[in-house]
């Protein structure tokens, strides 16, 4: 009887699992029969494991509710979610590469039931393995648009002596000046979060990985940021002794004894880190601290706890205390963004999210002053906030807690509000917008694509709970958001940009077939993100110093303090902030 009725239920459009009968079923079957269908769905959810029917039912429900909510939001004013498709990876870590492709990496799943923990945090041996894929947006949305780029096989000190693809789950990462991604730390598979000493580099030009010398200490949940000289600073993280044994050692990659990799051909292999004279005592409650290099050349470390706030000088190797954040509490996984500052690099950071009870946002200046800014509609954790080409901010994703979407731990059912985006304009005003398809909290991510769209992905629990075909190899999902500026008329055109590296404080020429439409030129840093952490964000205007026919002369930023060396997306904008598609440029 159960199987026969379940088959009938699949033919009916889905709605939320809230214990009530669906209106369309009541109309077609009568109240009593409709309620029977509701009970069947609840029984299916209670069966051993998590059924395929439950996943399809949940995805259909989310699709319907998304359409209902988003009918109220006009794309011209709020933007729209345009695409939703499956991917082969959970994308707990992502990076927007200067080749135009997106690197997705995470772990081999331990569980398909989203009411259980799917990550291998406490799994020894070869089952604790990493995986990685490239998505090429130019190839569309099918399986052929993805390429597997398996990390190097190696042995980690977990006592098993078993080789496996490097378990870089819960590592930290940032870009090197040559466009490569440095990945540091990972998961040893015991102790609730024991940090590996792994040091890897992904080369987007050859689409391959290289292994470097182990770090001095193991790190699980570290943060990494690029200093103005192009070297990466690695801070915090739990050691190889497990959760609660965080390290205060700051490491630098590459070590000062090795050159900074500016050229594409200089691939770091077997390169060591070295340690700074100063430490970073973020403590056990400040995993994945936010790190940002501001235009004074210092790296600002903003811990989860209100008192763990410092500015690090990477040249003098010193640390300066900053005032405590005014909220006075511990903030969990929330976002932070270096705010645009016109023609110069950022000199302030906006801290937001990480506290479900506090919708306020907090701005820290490089002078060490805090001020409360305008609040968002509600508090949320696990959110991702991005800088857009028009200098507005976009928040996607969010949850009530780490694996809690408003209905208890490991319950995939989500409060609708956590699916709604929020945007912040130049005046600092926030407004709620359309809803994404999936709730996405812990391990969710987002990046701005070179065409101005936003890729939203991550959260393996929700991806498993809403997988339309759990037995295939496409257990992740991606959705694409089109900001409002993509619905406000024709776009400027950027046709040519210099191929070689640009020098600071000099002018360079770009070509456009729409010169009269161009009012502004901006740089937007590509980002690499995980766990609501995105240390590479940056937005900078470039002065237009000369116009001649279809050519524009643009003024490069004054120094590496304003724009650390590396690759950036260059956009041309019209008077309404509508951007062109980007061209890649590099600075050194």
Summary of predicted features, one role per range:
Residues 1-16:
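Secretory targeting and sorting signals
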């Amino acid at each position: 009887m159960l199987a026969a009725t379940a088959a009938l239920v699949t033919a009916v459009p889905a709605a939320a699992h809230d214990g009530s009968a669906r209106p369309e079923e009541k109309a077609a079957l009568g109240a009593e029969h409709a309620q029977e269908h509701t009970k069947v769905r609840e029984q299916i959810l209670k069966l051993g494991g998590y059924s395929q029917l439950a996943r399809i039912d949940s995805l259909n429900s989310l699709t319907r509710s998304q359409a209902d909510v988003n009918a109220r939001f006009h794309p011209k004013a709020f933007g729209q979610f345009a695409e939703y498709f499956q991917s082969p990876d959970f994308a707990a870590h992502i990076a927007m590469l200067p080749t135009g492709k997106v690197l997705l990496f995470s772990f081999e799943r331990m569980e398909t039931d989203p009411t259980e923990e799917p990550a291998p945090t406490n799994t020894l041996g070869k089952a604790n393995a990493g995986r990685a894929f490239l998505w090429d947006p130019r190839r569309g949305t099918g399986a052929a648009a993805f390429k597997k780029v398996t990390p190097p096989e190696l042995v980690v000190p977990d006592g098993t002596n078993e080789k496996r693809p490097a378990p870089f789950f819960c590592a930290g990462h940032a870009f090197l000046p040559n466009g490569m991604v440095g990945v540091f730390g990972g998961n040893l598979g015991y102790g609730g979060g024991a940090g590996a000493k792994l040091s890897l580099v992904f080369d987007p030009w050859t689409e391959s990985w290289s292994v470097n010398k182990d770090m001095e200490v193991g790190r699980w949940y570290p943060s990494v940021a690029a200093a103005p000289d192009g070297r990466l600073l690695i801070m915090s993280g739990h050691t190889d002794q497990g959760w609660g044994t965080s390290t205060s050692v700051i490491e630098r990659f590459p070590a000062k004894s090795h050159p900074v990799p500016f050229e594409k051909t200089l691939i770091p292999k077997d390169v060591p880190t070295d340690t700074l004279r100063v430490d970073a005592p973020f403590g056990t409650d400040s995993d994945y601290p936010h790190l940002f290099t501001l235009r004074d050349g210092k790296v600002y470390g903003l811990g989860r706890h209100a008192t763990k706030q410092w500015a690090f000088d990477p040249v003098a190797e010193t640390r300066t205390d900053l005032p405590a954040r005014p909220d006075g509490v511990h903030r969990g996984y929330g976002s932070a963004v270096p705010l645009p500052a016109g023609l110069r690099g950022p000199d302030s950071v906006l801290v937001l999210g990480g506290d479900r009870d506090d919708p306020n946002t907090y701005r820290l200046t490089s002078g060490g002053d805090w001020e409360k800014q305008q609040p968002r509609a509600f508090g949320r954790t696990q959110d991702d906030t991005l800088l857009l080409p028009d200098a507005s901010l976009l928040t996607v994703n969010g949850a009530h807690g780490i694996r809690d979407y408003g209905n208890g731990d490991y319950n995939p059912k989500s409060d609708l509000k956590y699916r709604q985006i929020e945007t912040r304009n130049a005046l600092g005003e926030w407004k709620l917008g359309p809803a994404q398809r999936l709730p996405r909290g812990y391990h969710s991510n987002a990046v701005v694509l070179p065409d101005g769209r936003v890729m939203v992905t991550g959260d393996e629990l929700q991806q498993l709970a809403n997988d339309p075909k759990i037995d295939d190899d496409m257990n992740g999902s991606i959705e694409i958001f089109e900001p409002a500026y993509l619905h406000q008329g024709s776009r400027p055109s950027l046709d040519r940009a210099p191929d070689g590296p640009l020098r600071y404080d000099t002018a360079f020429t770009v070509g456009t077939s729409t010169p009269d439409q161009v009012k502004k030129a901006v740089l937007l840093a590509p980002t690499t993100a995980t766990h609501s952490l995105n240390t590479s964000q940056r937005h900078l205007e470039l002065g237009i110093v000369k116009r001649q026919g279809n050519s524009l002369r643009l003024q490069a930023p004054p120094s590496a303090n304003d724009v650390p060396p590396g690759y950036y997306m260059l956009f041309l904008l019209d008077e309404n902030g509508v951007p062109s598609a980007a061209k890649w440029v590099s600075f050194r």
